[in-house]
Design a protein with these regions (language model features):
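Conserved, structured C-terminal
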Residues: 1-214
């Protein structure tokens, strides 16, 4: 059965090059890459709380998302903040996260991908396993559509852009031009502080029969 646990759980994300060292100082569980590889999940004891740690990131750096009963939110936040001082921990908001994820070309559902975009057009074919053995319920929903697009070619594709002029800003929905002709529009834009210029993601039209690998 399914139930809505939105109001029952809190979440804090610890991300960055020092995230493992910081989190390891709060728990006895081995957080090495060998023990907890990318996309793994485990329960951790942090102080007086048990958290569910997801080894995942949305900023292009090492990171974890910690989920816990909502009543432990303040306790865990204060514990992480006090411990994080020795690791130069800083709080960041969504604009910071957005800048980092666009530099890494991570797609955002609602901007770069929607339920109307094809997984291959979005450059996410690597997460679709067409050679996976079917379960007792058959293949996944959309299997036939993916196979068809794989052979017919992509209609559009996501590309990443970096402006060479550091004084110009990108937001989203700016036209993408080639030789004076509009060939697409940006779906996301921000300033890339690591790259030193505005960065964006956007769809451009594909040539006939162009595949995801072309």
């Amino acid at each position: 059965s399914l139930f809505n646990s939105t109001s029952a759980e809190g979440c804090i994300a610890i991300m960055g090059p020092n995230s493992r060292e910081l989190l390891q100082s709060l728990t006895d569980t081995d957080l090495s890459n060998e023990n907890l590889p990318f996309a793994s999940v485990c329960d951790l004891e942090i102080g007086m709380a048990t958290v569910r740690a997801h080894r995942i990131t949305y900023v292009g750096e090492l990171g974890w998302e910690l989920y816990f009963p909502i009543e432990f939110s303040n306790y865990i936040a204060e514990l992480i903040e006090s411990t994080g001082k020795q690791f130069s921990l800083k709080l960041c908001g969504m604009h910071s996260v957005d800048s980092c994820r666009i530099e890494k070309a991570y797609r955002h559902f609602g901007h770069d991908i929607t339920d109307e975009d094809h997984v291959l057009d979005a450059g996410l074919g690597f997460v679709v396993k067409l050679d996976k053995n079917p379960s007792k319920y058959g293949t996944f929903i959309g299997y036939d559509a993916v196979k068809k697009r794989q052979f017919s070619g992509c209609k559009k594709r996501v590309m990443q852009f970096l402006l060479t002029n550091p004084d110009v800003m990108l937001y989203h929905n700016e036209p993408i031009l080639k030789n004076g002709e509009i060939i697409g529009y940006l779906s996301s834009g921000a300033y890339g502080h690591t790259l030193g210029g505005a960065v964006g993601l956007g769809y451009i039209d594909c040539l006939s029969n162009e595949t995801e690998e072309d």
